[in-house]
Amino acid sequence: MAMLLGASVLILWLQPDWVNSQQKNDDQQVKQNSPSLSVQEGRISILNCDYTNSMFDYFLWYKKYPAEGPTFLISISSIKDKNEDGRFTVFLNKSAKHLSLHIVPSQPGDSAVYFCAAS
């Protein structure tokens, strides 16, 4: 099963970056689409991810701190449009090929690199 990753950075005033998927061709199939995001502690943080392949049926979010490996946060299958786990909620809009991660409330410990993945 192939898995594609995009990444963004959350620095409590979230600094998401564009990252190419790990495809060998130029077609980006998963990408983060927020160039920057400023969030106050206690507010909602929203990270967005778009994908191009309608055959994807499973979507995951990971969090990575410097000098550590990625940690799984939350996932959603293509048969759902919402999944909640504690402060994290992921929304999936299949017709728009878009998913978003909502973090409520934002905390200083949320400052990290966030990865969106699809398979």
Curated annotation (Swiss-Prot):
Pfam families on file: V-set (PF07686)
Keyword vocabulary terms for this entry: Adaptive immunity, Cell membrane, Disulfide bond, Glycoprotein, Immunity, Immunoglobulin domain, Membrane, Receptor, Signal, T cell receptor
GO MF terms held by the record: MHC protein binding; peptide antigen binding
Annotated glycan sites: 93
Gene Ontology CC, one term: plasma membrane
GO biological process: adaptive immune response; immune response
Annotated ranges, domain Ig-like: 22-119
Disulfide bonds: 49-116
Entry's localization field: Cell membrane
Quaternary state and interactors: Alpha-beta TR is a heterodimer composed of an alpha and beta chain; disulfide-linked. The alpha-beta TR is associated with the transmembrane signaling CD3 coreceptor proteins to form the TR-CD3 (TcR or TCR). The assembly of alpha-beta TR heterodimers with CD3 occurs in the endoplasmic reticulum where a single alpha-beta TR heterodimer associates with one CD3D-CD3E heterodimer, one CD3G-CD3E heterodimer and one CD247 homodimer forming a stable octameric structure. CD3D-CD3E and CD3G-CD3E heterodimers preferentially associate with TR alpha and TR beta chains, respectively.
UniProt-recorded name of the protein: T cell receptor alpha variable 29/delta variable 5
Origin species: Homo sapiens
